From Swiss-Prot:
Family label: Belongs to the adenylosuccinate synthetase family.
Catalytic reaction equation(s): IMP + L-aspartate + GTP = N(6)-(1,2-dicarboxyethyl)-AMP + GDP + phosphate + 2 H(+)
PROSITE patterns, per database record: ADENYLOSUCCIN_SYN_1, ADENYLOSUCCIN_SYN_2
Entry's localization field: Cytoplasm
Binding site for substrate: 298-304
Protein's UniProt name: Adenylosuccinate synthetase
Keyword annotations of the record: Cytoplasm, GTP-binding, Ligase, Magnesium, Metal-binding, Nucleotide-binding, Purine biosynthesis
Cofactor: Mg(2+)
NCBIfam families: PRK01117.1, purA
Pathway: Purine metabolism; AMP biosynthesis via de novo pathway; AMP from IMP: step 1/2
Record organism: Listeria monocytogenes serovar 1/2a (strain ATCC BAA-679 / EGD-e)
Transmembrane segments: none
């Protein structure tokens, strides 16, 4: 039995899809355990670029099981569209399994999400307006509708009718927006469910059976540790738990069956949406990194905010996710920058702190303490091993490992699969 969890160590968009796709080659099952179609991942497979939002990266390997876990919230319409997108490109999706316990996103969740973000004005969270938060709210309030409910029209109608009474009052009286009629949703969404019912099952059984049979299972996180609802920059976070601990809740696999946790980190830092970002750059270097790194959101198309690598953030990720390995991505983007900076600590009211503060007021007053390292000018996109990297690039990686306390086991120097390199296998048994 061998299992690996892939988590983002920053604010998402670290390149988890690429690393998951790379590690999928040696996995026999790949599972997502939280989030929804608010997170996009870009995968290049057999020379073709795919952009997915719901379906796990493992879908391209027809001999491997690809799982949408119970901890996810699934927009049935978006799922049907994504399946069609893959089918139109000739991708076989018969290896997909969808948890019957996953909750669904309905049109009222999306409308409430949009209305609430608009109402907040300057205090907005910066959500993708995909209905994720409201769907998780319903789940916590025990009024959510699960995929198993969607597949039974009588049950779906009963629950939908009950929820529409409450949601329409909220939309009409509080937000002053038009509500929904039962017939607006019932038949359309029931039909979506019928289109993917062949994939629906108890995925906890599927995953545990795979592990018990000695198979390799890969768990794919969405977003990142700093967007975790408990451990992130609350309230500027997502509504689920991207940290490694979310795996056990969102997949139905116990913690004793998790072997390694790979934290994916960019060689710099980015963020989409509002919220604190201590190392954010507002100068020409930030603009250069954004353009060279194509830093625009997969889901929203919004320009990402860009900053220097923050070891305080990644140390926090190491602690709360129990990272065993680090995968450093987009090293090539830093090529040509004369002097690189790594944030090693923060200054808060004149005092040096090395741990990430919980208070946003404190965080707003934090000033990054930087360590400068010489950059490199050599093109590294064609390297095939660690030894091929320029000395300054290797020193940069070594310093990140020292500051974060996590060994760098993988690094990537470009978007293609061949540009990802392994220093130490994360599939090791010890």
């Amino acid at each position: 039995m061998s299992s690996v969890v892939v988590v983002g160590t920053q604010w998402g968009d670290e390149g988890k899809g690429k690393i998951t796709d790379f590690l999928s080659e040696n996995a026999e099952a790949i599972a997502r355990y939280q989030g929804g179609n608010n997170a996009g991942h870009t995968i290049k497979f057999d020379g073709v670029t795919y952009k997915l939002h719901l379906i796990p990266s493992g879908i391209f390997y027809k001999e491997k099981i690809s799982v949408i876990g119970n901890g996810m919230v699934v927009d049935p319409k978006a799922l049907v569209e994504e399946l069609k997108y893959l089918h139109d490109k000739g991708v076989d999706t018969s290896n997909l399994r969808i948890s019957n316990r996953a909750h669904i996103i309905l049109p009222y969740h999306i409308r409430i999400d949009e209305a609430d973000e608009e109402r907040k004005g300057a205090n907005k969270i910066g959500t993708t307006k995909k209905g994720i938060g409201p769907a998780y709210m319903d789940k916590a309030a025990r009024v959510g509708i699960r995929i198993i409910d969607l597949l039974d029209k009588e049950t779906f109608k009963e629950k939908l009718e009950h929820n529409l009474g409450e949601k329409n009052r909220l939309l009409e009286r509080f937000y002053e927006l038009e509500g929904f009629k039962l017939e607006d949703i019932l038949d359309e969404y029931y039909e979506y469910g019928q289109q993917f019912k062949e994939y629906v099952c108890d995925t906890s059984v599927v995953l545990n059976d795979a592990l018990d049979d000695g198979k390799r299972v890969l768990f794919e996180g969405a977003q990142g540790v700093m967007l975790d609802i408990d451990q992130g920059t609350y309230p500027f976070v997502t509504s689920s738990n991207p940290i490694a601990g979310g795996v056990t809740i969102g997949s139905g696999v116990g913690p004793s069956k998790i072997n390694h946790v790979v934290g994916v980190a960019k060689a710099y830092t980015t963020r989409v949406g509002d919220g604190p970002f201590p190392t954010e750059l507002f100068d020409s270097i930030g603009d250069t990194i954004r353009e060279v790194g194509h830093e625009y959101g997969t889901t929203t198309g919004r320009p990402r905010r860009v900053g220097w690598f923050d070891s305080v953030v990644v140390r926090h990720a190491r602690r709360v996710s129990g990272l065993t390995d680090l995968s450093l991505t987009l090293l090539d983007v830093l090529t040509g920058i004369e002097t690189l900076k790594i944030c090693v600590a923060y200054k808060l009211d004149g005092k040096t702190i090395t741990e990430f503060p919980a208070s946003l007021k404190d965080l707003a007053r934090c000033e990054p303490v930087y360590e400068e390292l010489p950059g490199w000018t050599e093109d590294i996109t064609g390297v095939t091993s660690l030894d091929d990297l320029p000395v300054n690039c290797r020193h940069y990686m070594e310093r990140i490992a020292q500051l974060t306390g996590v060994q760098v086991s993988m690094f990537s120097v470009g978007p293609d699969r061949a540009q990802t390199h392994v220093i130490k296998s994360v599939w090791r048994l010890a």
